[in-house]
Regions:
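Active-site-proximal flexible loops/turns
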Residues: 9, 54, 282
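Bacterial signal peptide processing site
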Residues: 20-22
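Alpha-helical scaffolding within the catalytic cores
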Residues: 26-31, 256-258
Length: 302
């Protein structure tokens, strides 16, 4: 099976619940980046955009956040959710520009629609959107079936704390930029990813989702790195995959690193919370900062 399946999971979960009595203590990727000359400091937290209601983050994370003057996130999802007109306009980016999803998906449409119907996922509204939107809907379904919800994602927890303490919020990207990445994904790759996913046993897909969450929550860097390093590129789609990878990871990570570098240069103290894969997909954020700052990984106890 082509391992490109994990692109669907990583891309959707890192880009766009369950409850239990016992606390769900997590130990996510966390780094301290400093410039000895200016005294500038940046804390970099690798986030998961979904989580559990009972998630407990280490005290060290909130202590570091409290030291900083600003929280930088990919986008302020709370502000976006409160601005329905802006959200509606951003969603238009994912609409089919010519025809409908059936035209876009061609001969794969009936099989994909049947799968979505069987999973109680299908809505006629989906027919207005490109396959990337269908993949996002499937990822949300998978997350819910695994006991995760975007209501308990790391970025939301950090934003809630920062706003409670009147911190400055910096958006490194916009919803429009993120949706455009999905819209720009080559159609052949969108269709391949979606088709491959619906042809995979659903329990296997859930297992991949749970493994991604486990690796993040335990800061299993080897597992996180392997999810990118072991990708098998579909035959004939090498160029399309390379462009998608640049848009989803490399280009964004260079921009994130530039924000950190500027903060360090100015002697600022900032807290940066972005999807964990941006700390591991080469060249990652830390690669762009190598030799320009002192980088320390912060490990947590059990």
């Amino acid at each position: 099976m082509k391992k490109i399946l994990s692109l669907l999971l990583i891309g959707a979960v890192m880009l766009f619940s369950g409850c239990a009595a016992r606390e769900n203590k997590v130990r996510p990727p966390f780094f301290k980046i400093t410039d000895p000359d200016t005294g500038g400091t940046a804390y970099l937290l690798g986030t998961m955009h979904v989580g559990k209601a009972n998630t407990v983050y280490p005290d060290e994370i909130y202590a570091a956040l409290g030291e900083c003057s600003a929280l930088a996130v990919e986008l302020d999802l709370q502000a976006l959710e409160a601005d329905q007109p802006r959200l509606n306009n951003a969603m238009k980016i994912l609409e089919c520009k010519n025809g409908s999803a059936s035209d876009f998906l061609g001969g794969d449409y009936d099989e994909i629609r049947t799968f979505f119907q069987n999973k109680q996922l299908y809505s006629p509204n989906l027919d207005a959107y490109i396959p990337a939107m269908w993949s996002s809907a499937l990822s949300n379904k998978l997350a819910g079936d695994c006991g995760y919800s975007s209501m308990y994602g790391t970025d939301r927890a950090m934003l809630t704390y920062a706003k409670k303490h009147s911190m400055k919020i910096v958006e490194l990207e916009s919803a429009e930029e993120q949706y455009q990445i999905n819209a720009n994904e080559p159609s052949e790759l969108q269709i391949y990813s979606l088709r491959s996913s619906i042809q995979t046993d659903y329990e296997i897909l859930k297992g991949q989702m749970k493994e991604l969450y486990r690796a993040w929550s335990e800061n299993d860097s080897a597992a996180l790195e392997s999810m990118i390093a072991e990708e098998e590129i579909p035959e004939g789609l090498e160029e399309e995959y390379a462009q998608y990878y640049y848009d989803m990871y490399e280009g964004r990570q260079e921009k994130m690193a530039a924000y950190i570098a500027e903060a360090l240069k100015n002697g600022d103290k900032v807290f940066v919370a972005v999807g964990a894969m941006h700390c591991y997909a080469p060249p990652d954020i830390l690669d762009f900062l190598e030799g320009k700052a002192v980088i320390e990984e912060i490990k947590f106890g059990n």
